[in-house]
């Protein structure tokens, strides 16, 4: 068995000319890359995923950006990410896929390689059909989800002009950047009317994509019964509560993946790791971490979304800054995280130590930090890089206590219902049910899986006429006081 040093050394030495690798050592190295299960998709993916932004969305002049994708596939990375919102990223993927013989019309089409990859794109559209689509967060004309799906397929596997070859498909399409509660309402609009004779004019993205996942035509948007999508997911970096509501509304387990911001400063903000992450894991979703370097802000990039090639970080880390190895290992050590999507600014086939792909992959397959070491990484990140890196994420200082608390008498018992609390920097470990000032029940925390409220049952004899409250606590459950 190869040591990690031998494995990364052999991968880092892979030349540009060899698309199949230089022999036994390379094949052994790729086969030994660890893989994790992407939730209920059942797919096995390497813990480092290739992001579709950075030099793929903002390539510098003269850069062969497609070679970044070729290099990633050569190194054994099999989760590949892009988006309709990422400028030329999808077109660059198409160039790389032609070099790798991944287009179905290629006489040398490499079907086994295609089947080993998990190709994911995103749509910012909230509707699949709408007579007057609302303007979304993405610049330009309003978008519709099925148009974005077709655009992705033609750019990745077709001619980029509308032609989609037979056999083309995406492993996943994610609804991009869910950042408002209104987004959640819109993407679910018309879902309940799927298959009805009176089709609504406005059909949300979920219902539209579901037809292209299942080969159905309940929305009237898939008359040829195409099966172009294997899985559907969501993404978001601004707010855990928004993603949590989208997941809770999904009572049919349609949403298989969630891409969320998870970096070493996460607990200084909305603490996705203590809110949406445990819910997604409980629902069996595949969890992908993003914003590992905070769009480069960890290494001096402006604290805003990437707008030009000059903002792309090209080095492996930065002198005096926290190690990129630590930043990558941090989210991958969180329970339930499958992989981390990281954009690449630069590769170097001649100097592996300067190759971001090699460095990031080496970090992703190294030993994971303990909880104590994660706290060290958090402290060092805040001290060296500052606590203000996550410009894209809401701040929340402490627990938001449960809402909609109700108590209903049912014969000899009282049913207590409430909607979930939101955690701050520390995870919620218990719910305390209080009658007046007395704690009458202490329950282990559990995520609220659907819109149905959380419940507990009390003997009516313990309640009397005093008010009932539910309090979230970071302490472990305790015995009745």
Language-model features: where?
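N-terminal binding-site loop/beta-alpha segment at the start of enzyme catalytic domains
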Residues: 2-118
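Hydrophobic faces of well-ordered beta-strands that scaffold small-molecule active sites
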Residues: 46-50, 80, 119-121, 173, ...
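Active-site mouth loops of central-metabolism enzymes
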Residues: 53-62, 131-144, 313-318
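Glycine/proline-rich, positively charged
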Residues: 137-264, 281, 285-288
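Structured C-terminal cap/extension of enzyme domains
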Residues: 251-254, 271-406, 411
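Conserved aromatic anchor
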Residues: 414-425
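Recognizes extended acidic, P/S/T-rich segments that occur
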Residues: 430-464
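Beta-strand-rich modules
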Residues: 459-477
């Amino acid at each position: 068995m190869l040591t990690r040093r031998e494995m990364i050394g052999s991968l880092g030495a892979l030349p540009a000319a060899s698309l199949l690798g230089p022999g036994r050592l390379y094949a052994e190295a790729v086969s030994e890359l660890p893989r994790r299960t992407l939730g209920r998709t059942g797919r096995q993916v390497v813990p480092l995923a290739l992001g579709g932004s950075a030099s793929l969305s903002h390539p510098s002049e003269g850069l062969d950006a497609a070679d970044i994708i070729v290099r990633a596939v050569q190194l054994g990375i099999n989760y590949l990410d892009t988006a309709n919102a990422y400028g030329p990223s999808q077109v660059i993927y198409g160039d790389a896929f032609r070099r790798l013989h991944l287009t179905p019309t290629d006489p040398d089409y490499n079907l086994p390689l295609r089947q080993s990859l998990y190709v994911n794109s995103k749509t910012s559209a909230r509707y699949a059909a709408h007579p007057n689509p609302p303007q979304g967060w993405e610049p330009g004309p309003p978008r519709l989800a099925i148009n974005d799906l077709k655009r992705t397929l033609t750019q990745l596997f077709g001619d980029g002009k509308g032609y989609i070859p037979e056999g083309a498909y995406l492993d996943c399409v994610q609804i991009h950047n869910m950042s408002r509660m209104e987004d959640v309402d819109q993407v679910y609009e018309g879902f309940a009317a799927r298959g009805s004779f009176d089709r609504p004019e406005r059909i949300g993205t979920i219902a539209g994509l579901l037809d292209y996942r299942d080969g159905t035509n309940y929305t009237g948007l898939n008359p040829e019964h195409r099966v172009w999508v294997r899985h559907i997911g969501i993404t978001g970096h601004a707010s855990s509560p928004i993603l949590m509501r989208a997941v809770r509304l999904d009572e049919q387990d349609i949403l298989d993946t969630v891409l969320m911001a998870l970096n070493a400063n996460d607990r200084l903000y909305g603490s996705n790791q203590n809110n949406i992450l445990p819910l997604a894991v409980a629902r069996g979703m595949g969890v992908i971490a993003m914003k590992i370097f905070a769009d480069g802000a960890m290494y001096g990039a402006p604290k805003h979304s990437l707008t030009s090639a000059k903002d792309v970080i090209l080095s492996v880390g930065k002198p005096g800054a926290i190690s990129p190895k630590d930043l990558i290992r941090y989210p991958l050590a969180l329970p339930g995280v499958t992989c981390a999507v990281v954009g690449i600014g630069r590769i170097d086939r001649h100097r592996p130590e300067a190759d971001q792909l090699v460095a990031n992959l080496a970090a992703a397959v190294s030993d994971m930090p303990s909880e104590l070491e994660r706290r060290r990484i958090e402290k060092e990140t805040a001290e060296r890089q500052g606590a203000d890196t996550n410009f894209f994420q809401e701040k929340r200082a402490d627990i938001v206590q449960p809402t909609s608390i109700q108590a209903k008498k049912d014969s000899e018992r009282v049913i207590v219902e409430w909607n979930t609390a939101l955690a701050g920097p520390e995870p919620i470990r218990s719910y305390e049910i209080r009658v007046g000032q007395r704690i009458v029940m202490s329950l282990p925390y559990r995520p609220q899986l659907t819109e149905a409220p959380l419940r507990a049952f009390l003997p009516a004899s313990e309640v009397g006429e005093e008010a009932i409250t539910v309090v979230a606590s970071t302490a472990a459950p305790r015995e009745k006081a």
